[in-house]
Design a protein with these regions (language model features):
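Amphipathic, non-transmembrane alpha-helical secondary structure
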Residues: 2, 39-46, 50, 138, ...
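Catalytic His-Asp segment of secreted/periplasmic serine-dependent ester chemistry enzymes
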Residues: 68-160
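Oxyanion-hole/transition-state-stabilizing segment in secreted/luminal serine hydrolases
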Residues: 1-38, 65-70
């Protein structure tokens, strides 16, 4: 981040859909673990928040993770993913700092658990299709502009 914050005033973090393949917690969270578990993600996000706040002149936009199509995940994994992204929006993200969220997961799922079939490349492929991408592109653009204009804490997290 030291290099990027020296070059950019706004930095956007994006995850690919495998971030949503969340396994059950073990009761032994580990910030250094590469295991995809809510307990680990929360510690990692808290560490990331501390680091990002050490660059107050830079604004950071964190996408909620991408959803998976129903055929590519289990209901339990999808529920854990939604639980984590809800925590990111409602608890981790705090007003008044330099960190903002774009709720991509909400756009993909429309409040459900899975990437909607009509937004996916196919019922087996969790990549967003061209039609959905064309719908989402102006929304992330609007979200970025809202953050730049100082409206990041009051504007819609989806860009709608």
């Amino acid at each position: 981040l030291e290099i990027l914050t020296g070059q950019y005033q706004v930095i956007v973090f994006k995850h690919c859909y495998p971030v949503s393949s969340i396994k059950p917690d073990t009761g032994k969270p580990d910030v250094s673990s590469n295991e995809k578990r809510v307990e680990n993600y929360k510690l990692q996000y808290e560490a990331l928040k501390t680091k990002m706040r050490s660059f107050p002149a830079t604004r950071f936009i964190v996408w909620t993770g991408a959803a998976r199509v129903k055929k590519a995940t289990s209901r339990d994994e999808a529920e854990r993913a939604r639980q984590f992204f809800t925590w990111v929006k409602n608890d981790w993200d705090e007003p008044g700092d330099n960190i903002f969220v774009w709720d991509f997961h909400e756009l993909e799922t429309e409040g459900g658990l899975y990437l909607k079939d009509e937004y996916a490349v196919s019922k087996e492929d969790s990549h967003p299709n061209k039609s959905f991408s064309m719908k989402a592109a102006p929304l992330i653009s609007k979200r970025i502009v809202d953050v730049i204009q100082g409206k990041g804490d009051v504007a819609s997290l989806t860009g709608k």
